[in-house]
């Protein structure tokens, strides 16, 4: 590498961000993923002074005193709280720029910071601006937006530049993004505001309705991860779920089965399936034929739900595969486009 390029690397910093409803990941060019934290901010009520961000804030969900509120700035894949999103981005970008030194830590200085942020496909111009502005206020000089399914497809290594169909289904915390991609462009896509959060909420509603048991988001997520599945498993499992009895208000433990949790998640899973089917139905015949051979690629945290690939393959008749590391797919995609400027401008909307 020339002296010029070494100096250029020191003067500029390129950052890719998967700004997710559930988690935020930050990729720094030539260094890889530097931040992987929950998209949660804890603040003092009244003053909105930030108390904690990320892992520390998530541990506070449902456990804060009256003076502190733990919030998730994004809902359904888009920004719900502008101020908190800006605070969170500032924290994560600062963390991505921080390096450990022998005598402490040091923030890497950069004359120019270029940021690529992944966003749901089909969001409005107002919603795009709501992403760009906090990123700029957090220190970015240039901000590019890339649609999440495109970023995920690039991240998992699909040959998107080929003249053939590639299908990606990215199931995040707030949205499910379905897209058919060919020649570096999205030919057909669908975004539904159903994701991991909706699965958690369906479990909360089920426990409340059937057992009069109130459980929190973290407990519901743990149940989903532990015994949740999209299809019948060889051996049904059980799990003790702790919560508050809605009748007498006392702590209570209920044993639930994987079959019950599968039933609880049936509605949001059906919505995800419908979005896949609609996208397939609207896909040009030649590209649809490609998908029979290439199959569907699953990415995002929701792809880790037990048996989801098997269930989707059964329901669509198309081979379905889970990405090697579905949680990192989008941020890896933002990282890859940062390495090629011409490609970056081709697959993203203009920087600001």
Question: Where on the chain are the PLM-derived regions?
Answer:
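Nucleotide/phosphate-binding catalytic cleft detector across ATP-hydrolyzing
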Residues: 1-171, 179-297, 303-352
């Amino acid at each position: 590498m020339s002296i010029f390029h070494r100096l250029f690397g020191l003067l500029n910093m390129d950052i890719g961000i998967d700004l997710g409803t559930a988690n935020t990941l930050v990729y720094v060019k030539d260094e890889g993923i530097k931040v992987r934290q929950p998209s949660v901010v804890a603040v003092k009520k009244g003053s909105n002074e930030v108390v904690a961000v990320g892992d520390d804030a998530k541990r506070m969900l449902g456990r804060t005193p009256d003076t502190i509120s733990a919030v998730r700035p994004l809902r359904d894949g888009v920004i719900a709280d502008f101020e908190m999103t800006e605070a969170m981005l500032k924290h994560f970008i600062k963390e991505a720029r921080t390096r450990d030194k022998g005598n402490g830590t040091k923030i890497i200085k950069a004359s120019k910071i270029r940021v690529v942020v992944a966003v749901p496909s089909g969001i409005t111009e107002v919603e795009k601006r709501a992403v760009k502005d906090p990123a700029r206020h957090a220190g970015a000089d240039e901000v590019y937006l890339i649609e999440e399914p495109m970023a995920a497809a690039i991240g998992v290594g699909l040959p998107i530049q080929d003249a053939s169909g590639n299908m990606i289904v990215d199931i995040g915390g707030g949205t499910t993004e379905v897209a058919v991609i060919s020649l570096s462009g999205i030919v057909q896509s669908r975004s539904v505001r159903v994701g991991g959060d909706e699965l958690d909420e369906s479990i909360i509603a089920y426990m409340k309705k059937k057992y009069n048991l109130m459980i929190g988001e973290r407990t519901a997520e743990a149940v989903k991860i532990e015994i949740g599945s999209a299809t019948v498993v060889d051996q049904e499992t059980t799990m003790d779920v702790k919560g508050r009895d809605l009748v007498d208000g006392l702590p209570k433990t209920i044993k639930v089965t994987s079959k019950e949790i599968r039933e609880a998640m049936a509605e949001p899973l059906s919505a995800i399936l419908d979005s896949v089917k609609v996208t397939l139905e609207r896909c040009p015949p030649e590209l649809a034929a490609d998908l029979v051979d290439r199959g569907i690629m699953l990415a995002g945290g929701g792809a880790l739900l037990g048996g989801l690939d098997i269930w989707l393959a059964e329901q669509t008749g198309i081979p379905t595969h889970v990405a090697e590391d579905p949680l990192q797919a989008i941020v890896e995609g933002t990282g890859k486009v940062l390495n090629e400027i011409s490609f970056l401008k081709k697959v993203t909307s203009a920087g600001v």
